[in-house]
């Protein structure tokens, strides 16, 4: 089974998102983080599911609304590069 790994920035993104959402609703934060990890496993299994991002060479994206998961293919699976809110200035965060 293909694997995924989290880049340090992606790990940080997930922690920040979880903390932020938990301030309002702990259960929602728990469900959201769970959805992220379910999505990572699915993307590892089917890496072409995500949208190719020509503006970010080597990256693909997949929405976990309202967030966007950015990842890249690796020989042994995928690497999750970032998990960003869709309303953020993604170009500046992925440079």
Regions found by a protein language model. Name each.
Residues 3-55, 59, 95:
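Basic, Lys/Arg-enriched alpha-helical interface segments
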Residues 67-68, 72-95:
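Enriched for short, Lys/Arg-rich terminal
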Residues 1-3, 73:
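Extreme N-terminus of proteins, especially the signal/transit-peptide cleavage junction
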Residues 48-77:
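Basic/aromatic recognition patch in beta-strand/loop cores that engages polyanionic ligands
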């Amino acid at each position: 089974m293909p694997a995924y790994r989290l880049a340090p920035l992606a790990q940080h993104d997930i922690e920040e998102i979880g903390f932020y959402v938990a301030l309002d609703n702990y259960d929602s934060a728990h469900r959201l983080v769970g959805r992220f990890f379910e999505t990572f496993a699915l993307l590892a299994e089917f890496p072409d599911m995500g949208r190719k991002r020509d503006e970010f060479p080597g990256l693909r994206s997949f929405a976990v609304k309202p967030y966007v998961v950015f990842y890249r293919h690796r020989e042994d699976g995928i690497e999750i590069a970032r998990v960003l809110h869709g309303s953020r200035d993604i170009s500046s965060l992925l440079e």
